[in-house]
Amino acid sequence: FGLVASFLWIFAAIYSVGYMRGNKEKNQTRFYAFYAMAVHAALCIAYADDLLTLFIFYEVLTFSTYPLVTHKQNEMAQKAGRLYMSILVGSSVILLLPAIVWVWVATGSLEMSQNGVLDGKIDVAYAPLLLAMFVFGIGKAALMPIHKWLPAAMVAPTPVSALLHAVAVVKAGVFTMLIVLTNVFGIDFLAKTGASEWLIWLASFTLLATSIIAIYKDDLKARLAYSTISQLSYITLGGALATSMATQAVSYTHLRAHETSRY
């Protein structure tokens, strides 16, 4: 994720310069500053070693992309920005942060491991609840019903759409989801407890529903947004299956392929 994002950012940045100058957009310096900050936050998420660092830069990414979403400063952009912040900040503060605190209380650490850290540290009966807090706390993964921020954010300038779809935002969300499934819960723990079975159904429903919605959208950006949500759900589904083959397939193949195609 980090390598692909840093590579695609080069082309996205070059395009954004031409777009901003060609359309004579206002506040270009502010735009470039927050654009660079967003990519930096995404890379910090990619290389985070613990949940605290992950959460901090997850929030930095949210706040740095808000001025980009609302760049046009019209009523539609402001409305989209309010929805963007309310869903992403609300979900992370209300659900993601308490979930991280729960992990810290249970394990005594915020470090992550390739085999997970919760096996033997948490009551199996509470594992689905903790997973649900993580899943719905990671609003950037855009699972239903917390997906509406992405179609709304398409009012942003085209370079921001590339940032949202390919370079940083949604990929940071689904990458965080995979990290939680593999490095916090662990594939073996999920398979043994069945804690992610409900997530399989949710991801499957999301990918089917949003694919159908995308077909009936005439606006190209709206169709792209719902198509992106569908593809993100494929990645989440692969992680929720709790097998090494599925996890490797979505992390090494589908995640990178979707980043490149959306760009």
Give the predicted meaning of each segment.
Residues 8:
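Active-site-adjacent substrate/metal-binding segments within catalytic domains
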Residues 11-29, 33-54, 64-256, 261-262:
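Hydrophobic transmembrane alpha-helices and their helix-loop junctions in integral membrane proteins
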Residues 2-5:
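Predominantly extracellular/luminal regions of secreted and cell-surface proteins
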Residues 59:
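Short phosphate-coordinating micro-motif centered on Lys-Gly-acidic
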